[in-house]
Amino acid sequence: MFMKATETMICLVDGEHYLPVTRAAVETLDSMEHIDVKALIFIGGTEKLRTSSPEEYTEIMGRPVHFGDDPHRIPYKLIGELIRKYGADTVMDLSDEPVLDYSKRFRIASVVLGEGAVYRGPDFEFQPLTEYDILEKPSLKILGTGKRIGKTAVSAYAARLIHERQYNPCVVAMGRGGPEEPEIVHGDRIEITPEFLMEQSDKGVHAASDHWEDALMSRILTVGCRRCGGGMVGDVFITNMKRGAETANRLDADFVILEGSGAAIPPVKSNRHIVLVGANQPLINIKNFFGPFRIGLADLVIVTMCEEPMAGDEKVREIVDFIESINPEAEVITTVFRPKPLGEIEGKNVLFATTAPDSVKDLLVEYLESEYSCRVVGTTPHLSNRPLLQRDIERYIEDADVMLTELKAAAVDVATKDALEAGLEVIYCDNIPVVRDGAQDELDDAIISVVERAIADFNLRKTP
C-alpha cells in the first residue's frame, strides 16, 4: 500500500481572521496523516487580533507562532529563516486581502521557492524548480528574466572568455528548436561556414539554434537540447536537458556552462548563477511576479540594453537599485550590445540582419560604419519574422555585396539561403556586451570570479 511521506508545513496567518477560525483551519491541516504543521508565522492585520504577544498566541494556537519586527510589514526574511529552521517542505498561506495582495504573494513565493519549498494556498500552488543533481564537473548557469535580452550573446562571450582563461568549458544549451537527441557540435574542431550551416539546415537541423551560435561565436564544444513550454517560475514542460548534461559529463571538458532559454531555466543543478536582466523590459516584469526570484539566484547580474531608446539613465538606476535591494550579495554590471562581424567587411556594401529592435537601427548602423569602414545599404530587424525578413531582403539585396547577419531564428534558412543564391558573401555577426560605466575588465573579472567560486564549491562538495 502506498503511503505519503510526511509533509512538514509552516502556515502564514493574519489578524484579519478570528483566532478560532484560524485555529480550526490549522487543525484541519494537522489532522491529515501526511501533514505536520510545525509553526505559524503572523504576517499582519490587526482587526480581529486580541493579542500581539507571541507567547499568548502560541498558547492559543497550540504551536509556535512567530512575529516579524513590524506587524505592518510582511516578514519576508523571517519566512525564509523559519523554512530553514523547521526544514519545511511547504508554506501554506491562510491569509487573505487586505494583508496580502497579488504582488506580495509573488514576493512570498519568490522567498519560499528560493528556499526549495512549496508555496500553497486555497487555489494555487507554486513548486520549486526542478534541478537534477547529475553534473560531475563544476558548472554555472546563465539564465534571464525574459526573451530577447541577449542571453546567448552573453553566454557566447562568457564561454569564449572562460576558454581563453584555460578552464576548458563546454556549453549545454536548450532552445525551442533544439534536437530530439542532445547534439554535440565540435566548434573547437570544425569550420562553421555559411555553406556548412546550409547543409545542416537542408538535413532538417535548426542550424540557428543557440548551441550552433555558441559554437560559431566561441569556437568551443557545445551540446544542443530542446525544450517546450515555459512556466512562471522557470520550469519547462519537456526537455532533454538532463540527457544533455549527462552527455557533458562524458565529454573532454572541465567546466560546464548551462544556458537557459527565454525565461526558462535549465533543470540541472549548478554551482553558481549568472542572471541577465534586460533594461528594455517593462519594470513590472522585473520587480514583480518571478523577476525577484530569478534575481535572487544570481551571483552576478548583467543588466543589458542600458541605453536610449530602450532605457534611459533613470530607469537603469531604478533597475540596479532594485536588484541590489533584492540580492545585495550579487555583483551588478550594466552593459550595452555592439555588433562584431566575424569576417572582413571594410569597404563593402552591407545588408545587416538582426533581432535588435528597429528603434536602435540608426545607432547600430553608425557603429558598424564608423568602426568597420563599411557602407550599410539596408537593415532588417526581422530575423524572427520570416515573411517580413524575406520582404526586406528582396528590397535591399541588389545593392549589397555582403549579408551580415546574427545567427538567430531565420538566419540560415532564409537570410543565408537567399544571400548565397544571390551570389552574396555571408558573414555572421556576434553581439558583444560592452560595459556601460567602467572598464571592460570589470565584466571579465566578474565572470571569472563566478567561475572560480563554482570550482571551489564543486571541490568542497567532493571533499569527504
From Swiss-Prot:
Activity decreases in response to phosphate limitation. It is an enzyme of class 6 (ligase). One of its GO terms (biological process) is gluconeogenesis. Keywords: ATP-binding, Cytoplasm, Ligase, Nucleotide-binding. It catalyses: (2R)-2,3-bisphosphoglycerate + ATP + H(+) = cyclic (2R)-2,3-bisphosphoglycerate + ADP + phosphate. Induction: Constitutively expressed. Its EC number is 6.5.1.9. Optimum temperature is 65 degrees Celsius. Signal peptide: none annotated. One of its GO terms (molecular function) is ligase activity. Optimum pH is 6.0. Catalyzes the formation of cyclic 2,3-diphosphoglycerate (cDPG) by formation of an intramolecular phosphoanhydride bond at the expense of ATP. Not able to catalyze cDPG hydrolysis. May be involved in osmotic balance. Belongs to the cyclic 2,3-diphosphoglycerate synthetase family. This is Cyclic 2,3-diphosphoglycerate synthetase. The lineage of its organism: Archaea, Methanobacteriati, Methanobacteriota, Methanomada group, Methanobacteria. The gene is cpgS.
